[in-house]
Amino acid sequence: DRGAGEPAARFSTPLSSQAMHALRAQFDAIAVGSGTVLSDDPGLDVRLIDGRSPRPVAIDRRGRLTAAARIFSRPGAVCLTSVSRDDLPPEVSVITMAPDADPRAVIQALGRMGISSVMVEGGAELLRSFIDSGLWDDARVEIAPITLGKHGKSRVSLPSGTLTVASADGGNVIINVKNDGDSVN
């Protein structure tokens, strides 16, 4: 964890960042959990290539996010929450869900908004919930040769599937996993 005002650590290389933006441009929406928004305040847009930015989706089950989060200033922003969110800008689509709503309910709610493809970018808890529910087609993991803190630890383990490994510039390794089970489209 970093202190307030400290910039996020950069793990991606320029080449892998560009590839990530190309991947983002392929989806209708990009989803993150409230922990990721609170720690990183991501823009969830496409900047490094020419392409359409997906709709940003914040899954904020406990109502921890504020209107100041950068995600809520983006066009088409969506907030899935279990609490009243009258404090968010009127342009933000707020979907109220049960606090224990599973990933299928999230996908169904987004589908009713015309969103047919979702990239789940983080954090670890949200990613794990989609993987455990079988609601994934492909997973992409970038591993940087960096350890943070005294006891660096992996936040997300790889799901089962067909692995493809590629090296990226700067010593990073890209692992792609294809779901061998029933595909969810």
Question: Which ranges hold each PLM region?
Answer:
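Short, ordered loop/turn segments at secondary-structure junctions
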Residues: 84, 144-145
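Shared catalytic-loop signature of beta/alpha-barrel
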Residues: 138-144, 150-152
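Short acidic amphipathic segments
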Residues: 126, 130-138
